UniProtKB/Swiss-Prot annotation:
GO terms for biological process: transcription by RNA polymerase II. It is found in: Nucleus. Residues 34-95, 189-210, 265-322, 511-547 are annotated as: Disordered. Pfam families: RPAP1_C (PF08620), RPAP1_N (PF08621). The modification Phosphothreonine is found at residue 337. This is RNA polymerase II-associated protein 1. One of its GO terms (molecular function) is nucleotidyltransferase activity. Forms an interface between the RNA polymerase II enzyme and chaperone/scaffolding protein, suggesting that it is required to connect RNA polymerase II to regulators of protein complex formation. Required for interaction of the RNA polymerase II complex with acetylated histone H3. Residues 265-275 have a biased composition (Polar residues).
Length: 1409
């Protein structure tokens, strides 16, 4: 039945009707589908489709299939019912397949399958390039049997035929390349020749000339084999002489040109084979054994000495096996007998058997050369000479096969394997290597940083690409490695453990503090312009460039968050992978506010986490490993919400309102941890994190409505606390939960006292909503009676260090709550002050005074020095593996007990105690006298003495910034209490001067985020007369007495240092106003810090502190106003000076004089050279400023302090100075200013002369005598007023020839005269005299010529006085009018020098004495 094709008007109904008709007719279909066997391909030949009609083009030089760009996923298919697994398979093969040992994974490392790739050698050609093909070219190829072939197919076929012809011609060479006319002495022995004959070669399987072409395809191969066997039999029956004779006859019958052609091709093939043999590695046997070599011809190769081994014919495969295996060890018998029916057992393949040989012996490293690091599968660094057994899976066939372990390069190579287990294993090993490197296990055993090497090699993006894998095990390994890289061990534990400290929730962002070069170039731009430009540039920068400066930014640029969301939402990994992902998200959220916002705004990420890992209902979970975390509450998910909320108040508000976190908090807090149907440890951590999240929200004044709902729950929890605190032993997790509860109550109490901020006009403050807190004082007033018994109970354990350390932050949290409670109580204006005053007195009598009298408290004060990071800078040393692009606190092995965060640290408790004391004294000043004993504790005094001792500034690392931030809290609280006590005491305490020194040092060390503390120090301690007891105890008189002993008495009493100090003490209020105007932090930062420290929760915008790039104030902050004046004058040199220029300069000089006289340790960090540069700025500010009498007196006093004998050796102008790019440039501008406006001012001239000392750089003296010679006319400072000894300028002798020539020229020309510039005149005469009479035999010819010329010119001078001075100079003496002594008669050596001059010079004047 023949059906017509469908027509345009027919529909699907018609097609179905046609199909029904066709099926009813039962006709045979036009096409029959045949499904061949998928295993063996044993379909009948008659059913195979013909291939003649297809136009197939085969490329010999390219594989049939393109290489796989990505590793193919592992096939997940179960056996179909039609093909069950065979039950009669080999047990050994089944065991190998199910072997789960590590060696089973590493036994076959396959990166890409190349077994199917056909490798063909290029066709030899006599021309450099193949001929160009033209369509008009005639073809000799037989056309295809069926149909027309394409031009491309015909060309490929022609090339293949020509290649076959050349190959067949080459195969003729072994048979015809005979030693024609061989010399008898060069003929090899019979044994060697017999091995070289074709019949004796076991590897000769087929003939070279007889191909069977022309016969039928079925009998061609059989006939060829028959002919071959007959030829071999005849050759074996012949003698070698007969064979050679037959060869000679055959060569005589052939055309000589054909023989020459075949021999030339044989020589080319032999040379090619020799080159290939040389290129092979000597360690691996050659496997390219295809044909035997003929007897060599004496005409083609000349014999050479020692050429026997090289010319030895290549043995067959069996001979090679005998040669290689027999000399070593006897061949072992196989456990089974091989059968002839087995495939591929007739030919031994050496390259495949090479790996079965024994490993070469381990080479011992005899030298100190560096070796490649190798690691075990557990990430351990293996010693170069370690000898491990092979069953551990640490040996492979790469470089240095005898050494165990894997290098980083080999592990990177293994991550690209097609086998998923190998990729997962490589990632796991790399993860463990990173973990051990961060823990510092490698130490000095490796050269360089492992982490830096991995990141430079692209390890970060290798992990990112591995996350896109389809295999779950590879994804899990990649996530674990990413967590190991980003999340430093111990960092999160440290931050969690210190959350309940004094402002413990406020942390620095874990982001790099180094700015990019682009950011450094934009320092001069406005802030708004920088923000506008920075965002698009960062978006266009590639991820590797971002990761080079900031790893987190580079990762976020690779769309990491959507991939993690996909893994959580779609793949549903196991519990360990989920915890790793949550840990990575927490680390991303700690990076910055921007990163936290990206985590929050990632589509469906937070929704998935809240819904899947913080459900409100779940099935009970028992103790033990949880098979799945989905629909099960997870503490890490709650912690992620808490860290996100800490980044900003807006994020906290969005979490509470947009993700239904309020209901989650109610669900997890309403029940006790043991009633949550979760494992006990997980329940404790979950409840703790819920309390912390609520406390963070309460830090912004949010979450007050939850307090009303959960008020009964909180009261019940407080009532059970005494029972928990009395249990032994105390559980650390339970103590963390109790401390988190107290922290929550502290923030809720502060929220009850917060006053709504007034509407602000600034744009930075307008975003803060002025919404009053929903928590009132009435709701929190009943909490203190429940917390105070807990404090009393914990204080009883103070004499027991083991129990006290087990309490953790609980006592500190209790004290902080009480401080917040009394602070809020004192702010309630509608309540009677007498109530809270009496309650404070009761607390003092019942709790604080007994605590202060306990000896264990003194032990806490004594341990401050041991635990202080400021006194022990090495405790904050950065990890050698720390990277600037990946910030971490570096708490790998945990904190030692005697450290700022250790279990025995006194800082959290003492800081909380001082906070409570300050709150009580602020409200009740009558308690100050009873609590002042704290300030006189011996341990505190020793600690402060160590803090102000001269020492280099602590290096600012992420951990040191965190630790110092908490240490500075304690110091500030002590100083704040000392200020309150000093204002109430009639006489200053003995430790007042020490407290003042600590305040001055602390002011230069405070970090960003502590702007409010710096402002309070400037207002309170620093410029208070009470903290300068020297002003009332004979300090000015002692200063005058000291100056009289060292410098002599000054004529004018007003110029004495004592009078200047007295005036400075009177002007302290003006000095404070000056520094408040120039050293106060920015207003926005100050308001943010004030809101945080004063408990103004409605103004707090974030708990993330600014990045600690550097301290708030520079180390030379006392000179800061003066530097501002200098910069302002430099920016507007022609403008009029400011009205307050004289006042600012005078206040700065007064304060610096006070510090130089009574607090010299504060200026220890400012080098003397930097102080000199600041004094020079006084003269550069204005042309008339230095003429003011107060300025001159203060500068003279400071210059005298700078020129003291004990300070002068430390005056080094050649080293880099802080805040100064180049001192020579500053000195050059100073000389210009002196020449223009000085009018011979002596004090100005003293500052000019001070850098010209002999020990300083010659550049400064060259600048004066070369470019500013006019200065010499006005530099009339007398010798008696020189602040330093004259010998500092004249000794040692000058060795700069250009400067000596300038000296001589200035003297000869009259530019430098004794009455104009007596000091430099003396210096020039001394150095020229020393030069012209120098007898150094090592001098160069140029120096000798210049010396002789200068001496001759000196002798011929017409100025008798100058010649007398240059020739008869003896020693410098500032007491003489000339400034030096003269010889009455020239010494003999000088006379001899003069006698060496030319005779005409001597005749003119003779030798005068």
């Amino acid at each position: 039945m023949m059906l017509s094709r469908p027509k345009p008007g027919e529909s699907e109904v018609d097609l179905l009707r046609f199909q029904s008709q066709f099926l009813e007719a039962g006709a045979a279909p036009a096409v029959q589908l045949v499904k061949g066997s998928r295993r063996h391909g044993d379909a009948p030949p008659d059913r195979l489709p013909p291939q003649d009609h297809r136009d197939v083009v085969m490329l010999d030089n390219l594989p049939d299939l393109p290489p796989a760009l990505l590793p193919a996923p592992a096939k997940r298919a179960r056996p179909s019912p039609g093909h069950p697994l065979p039950h009669d398979e080999d047990p050994e093969e089944r065991l190998n397949r199910h072997d789960q040992h590590i060696t089973a994974v590493l036994s076959k490392i396959v990166e890409r399958d190349t077994s199917s790739v056909t490798v063909t050698l290029p066709v030899p050609s006599g021309v450099a390039f193949p001929p160009v093909f033209h369509r008009s070219q005639e073809r000799q190829v037989k056309p295809a049997a069926s149909g027309k072939r394409s031009i491309f197919a015909q060309e490929i076929a022609a090339r293949r035929v020509s290649g076959n012809r050349v190959t067949s011609a080459e195969q003729v060479v072994p048979s015809l390349d005979t030693p024609e006319g061989a010399v008898p002495c060069e003929t090899p022995s019979f044994r060697d020749r017999s091995n070289q004959l074709p019949g004796r070669s076991h590897g000769f399987h087929r003939p070279n000339l007889v191909t069977g072409k022309g016969l039928r395809s079925k009998v061609a191969e059989q006939e060829v084999q028959t002919i071959h066997e007959e030829n071999v039999a005849r050759l074996q029956a012949m003698d070698p002489e007969e064979i050679l004779k037959e060869q000679q006859q055959l060569l005589a019958q052939l055309d000589p040109s054909l023989v020459a052609f075949l021999r030339s091709h044989s020589q080319v093939q032999e040379q090619t084979g020799t080159k290939a043999t040389k290129k092979q590695s000597p360690k691996r046997p050659s496997v390219l054994v295809t044909k035997e070599e003929p007897v060599t011809s004496t005409r083609t190769r000349e014999p050479r000495t020692g050429d026997k081994l090289e010319e030895k014919p290549e043995a067959t495969v069996e001979d090679k096996m005998e040669d290689k295996l027999q000399p070593r060890t006897p061949a072992l018998k196989l456990p089974m007998t091989p059968s002839k029916d087995w495939l591929h057992m007739d030919t031994v393949e050496l390259d495949k058997l090479h790996w079965t040989q024994d490993l070469p012996p381990l080479r011992r490293q005899q030298t100190q050369e560096r070796m490649q690091a190798r690691f075990s599968l557990q990430g351990e660094l293996l010693a170069p000479d370690v000898d491990l057994p092979t069953h551990l899976g640490l040996h492979h066939h790469g470089e240095e096969a005898e050494r165990a372990g894997y290098s980083l390069q080999e592990l990177f190579h293994l991550t690209r394997s097609q086998v998923s287990q190998q990729r997962a294993l490589a990632l796991q090993v790399l993860s463990q290597i990173v973990g051990r490197a961060q823990a510092g296990e490698f130490g000095d055993r490796l050269v360089g940083s492992v982490l830096r090497l991995l990141l430079d090699a692209g390890f970060l993006f290798l992990l990112r690409f591995s996350l896109d894998d389809r295999v779950d095990s590879v994804i899990a390994a990649a996530v674990r490695a990413l967590r190991t890289l980003l999340v430093a061990p111990g960092d999160e534990e440290l931050l969690d453990r210190t959350f309940s400290w004094y402002h413990g929730a406020s942390v620095f962002p874990l982001m790099p503090s180094q700015d990019d070069k682009e950011d450094e170039d934009e320092d001069e731009e406005l802030e708004t312009e920088k923000v506008k430009r920075k965002t698009p540039e960062e978006g266009s920068r590639p991820p590797p460039d971002l990761a080079r400066h900031d790893v987190i930014k580079g990762l976020l640029a690779t769309n990491l968050l959507p991939r993690l969301r996909y893994v959580l939402e779609v793949t549903c990994p196991g519990p360990s992978v989920i915890l790793d992902i949550l840990a990575v998200l927490i680390r991303l959220a700690r990076h910055s506010l921007e990163s936290a916002m990206r985590v929050l705004e990632c589509p469906r990420l937070m929704e998935t986490i809240v819904q899947e890992f913080l459900p409100t209902s779940w099935s009970p979970i028992g103790v033990g490993p949880t098979p799945s975390l989905y629909k099960v509450p997870c503490a890490s998910a709650m912690k992620l919400l808490r860290v996100l909320a800490s980044a900003g108040r807006n994020i906290a508000a969005r979490l509470l309102s947009g993700f239904d976190v309020r209901s989650r908090l109610c669900r997890f807090i309403a029940e006790a941890p043991h009633d949550l149907a979760l494992p006990p440890e997980e329940a404790e951590i979950l409840t703790t994190e819920a309390f912390r999240l609520w406390a963070v929200a309460a830090s912004y004044g949010q979450g007050g409505d939850l307090y009303r709902e959960l008020y009964p729950v909180l009261l019940r929890a407080l009532q059970t606390l005494p029972t928990e605190l009395s249990a032994h032993p105390l559980q650390p997790l339970a103590m963390q939960r109790v401390a988190a509860l107290f922290t929550l109550l502290t923030q809720l109490t502060l929220a009850a006292s917060s006053i709504p901020p007034e509407p602000a006009s600034g744009p930075a403050e307008s975003c803060v909503p002025a919404i009053p807190s929903s928590v009132t004082w009435t709701q929190v007033s009943g909490l203190k009676p429940l917390v105070e018994p807990c404090l009393k109970q914990t204080l009883k354990f103070l004499p027991r260090p083991d129990v006290w350390n087990a309490l953790g932050p609980v006592p500190s949290a209790c004290l902080l709550f009480l401080g917040a409670y009394y602070q809020a109580w004192s702010r309630q204006s509608h309540l009677c002050p007498e109530d809270w005053l009496q309650d404070m007195e009761r607390l003092l009598d019942e709790s604080l005074l007994p605590l202060l009298s306990q000896p264990p408290l003194g032990s806490l004060w004594d341990s401050l020095r041991d635990c202080s990071p400021l006194c022990n800078p090495l405790s904050c040393a950065s990890n050698p593996e720390a990277l600037p692009s990946l910030v971490s606190l570096g708490c790998a092995g945990g904190c030692p007990p005697l450290s700022v965060a250790g279990s025995a640290s006194p800082f959290p408790f003492l800081t909380a105690l001082l906070s409570l004391i300050n709150t009580l004294v602020q409200s009740h000043k009558g308690l100050c006298g009873q609590l002042s004993a704290v300030l006189t504790a011996p341990g505190l005094q020793n600690y402060f003495l160590q803090c102000v001792a001269p020492a280099p500034a602590p290096q600012l690392t992420p951990f040191s910034a965190w630790a110092l931030h908490h240490e500075y809290h304690l110091q500030y609280l002590v100083l704040s209490f000392a200020h309150k006590a000093a204002t109430l005491q009639p006489e200053p305490a003995a430790s007042t001067a020490l407290h003042h020194a600590v305040a001055l040092v602390l002011l230069s060390r405070l970090l960003p985020g502590s702007e409010y503390l710096a402002q309070e120090l400037l207002l309170s301690c620093v410029f208070r007369l009470e903290f300068l007891p020297e002003s009332a105890s004979g300090g000015p008189e002692a200063a005058d007495f000291s100056d009289g002993l060292s410098l002599g008495s000054s004529g004018d009493p007003q110029c004495r240092r004592g009078a200047l100090l007295v005036q400075a003490c009177r002007d302290l209020p003006s000095i404070r106003s000056c520094y408040l105007a120039h050293c106060s932090p920015a207003r926005a930062s100050l308001l943010s810090s004030q809101a945080l420290y004063c408990g103004e929760l409605l103004r707090v915008s974030s708990l993330l502190l600014p990045v600690p790039k550097e301290p708030l104030l520079a180390t030379d902050w006392p000179f800061q106003p003066l530097i501002h004046l200098y910069h302002r004058a430099s920016d507007t040199p022609s403008g009029p000076p400011a009205a307050d220029t004289v006042g600012v300069a005078m206040r700065v000089l007064q304060w610096v004089l006070v510090l130089e006289s009574w607090r010299p340790e504060v200026l220890w960090a400012v080098p003397p050279a930097a102080r000199l540069a600041r004094l020079m700025c006084v003269y550069l500010v204005d042309s008339e400023l230095f003429r003011e009498t107060p300025i001159q007196r203060l500068v003279a006093a400071l210059l005298a302090r700078l020129c003291r004998p004990q300070v002068l050796p430390n005056l080094k102008l050649d080293c880099p100075l802080p805040g100064l790019t180049s001192f020579p440039d500053l000195y050059a501008s100073f000389l210009d200013h002196f020449e223009a406006v000085s009018f011979g001012d002596h004090l100005f001239g003293a500052l000019v002369l001070l850098p010209l000392q002999r020990r300083f750089s010659v550049t400064l003296r060259l600048a004066l005598f070369g470019e500013h010679v006019g200065v010499l006319r006005a530099l009339g400072l007398p010798l008696t007023q020189l602040p330093v000894p004259l010998e500092c300028y004249t000794e040692p002798a000058e060795d700069s020839l250009p400067l000596l020539q300038l000296y001589f020229r200035a003297l000869v020309t009259g530019t430098l005269r004794a009455r104009w510039c007596p000091i430099l005149y003396t210096v020039a005469v001394a150095h020229v005299n020393s030069f012209i009479f120098c007898q150094d035999p090592k001098s160069s010819d140029e120096v000798k010529t210049a010396r002789r010329s200068m001496l001759q010119r000196t002798w011929l001078l017409t100025d008798e006085g100058l010649r007398q001075h240059l020739l008869h100079y003896k020693l410098p003496n500032s007491s003489l009018p000339e400034g030096f002594e003269l010889y009455s008669q020239l010494p003999r050596l000088r006379q001899q020098c003069l006698q060496t001059l030319p005779t005409e010079g001597l005749q003119n004047g003779g030798v005068k004495t």
